[in-house]
Amino acid sequence: MEPEALTSELSQLQLGGAVFVDTVEGVQSMLRQVRDGGVAEVAIDLEGVDLCRSGELCILQLSDGETTWVVDIFTLGEAAFAEGGLRAFMHDPAVLFVGFDGRADADALVYLYSARAASFYDVQIASCIRQDQEQGRRDRFVHGLGRATERFLRNDRDRALALERTKKAGLALFAPERGGSYAVWKQRPLPKALLDYAAADVALLLDMKREWEVFSPVEENKQKALVRIDRAVRSRLPAKGKQMAIKDF
């Protein structure tokens, strides 16, 4: 399970390595590396087709800030969570998972694989609270990862441009409005542009959390995240649609 060769754009994002994991043994090795390293915080994100309880989970990304793993859930399925140990790892309250709006991801994980992060910090909550405080008013809507990373990298033009190029290359393959199809996440081997895109999605989450937790302290954020994820998972409807843009914290 050797790190893939990084593109220059990803190197500028300061990722230590991007590892594609498509075997149960690879998942087990990944989790041993995380645990043996004493990692207390792990960035997480998911990719798939219509990602929610009614869709398909294809990719799960984890990053400890030094290495990013892109786990092939489409190929491994339940084995990644059972024999691989992902379910038990996610249920460990000693590990803080750091993500951006975990509602749709949790909806997919709970209904498709009976898995859920026991401890979750939502960078979207922190970013929105930061914005509200800086502008002196409460915005009625949440904003996405793109705006949050743009704000985070406002003084680092090189990294911002590298991220923009990486995201554009990936979106061109899977975003329908750009001529792509979400089904490409099921293509194997996974196109390099999608591997880079997936790795980039978690590249900055830990740094963003550390910078913005002054606006949204960990325990306070975890409670807000728990409430909004519970609401999404317990809803009779999948966690998707225009209502997801309304601020719910």
What are the functions of these language-model segments?
Residues 159-235:
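Acidic, Mg2+-coordinating catalytic module of metal-dependent nucleases/exonucleases
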Residues 123-155:
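Short alpha-helix plus adjacent loop in nuclease-associated cores
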Residues 103-114, 128:
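Short active-site loop/helix that positions an aromatic residue
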Residues 1-42, 46, 220, 232, ...:
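N-terminal accessory regions of nucleic-acid-interacting proteins
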Residues 41-54, 105:
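Short acidic, Gly/Ser-rich segments with clustered Asp/Glu that frequently serve as metal-coordination loops
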Residues 68-97:
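Nucleic-acid-processing active sites and adjacent nucleic-acid-binding tracks
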Residues 50-67:
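A short alpha/beta connector and helix-capping loop motif
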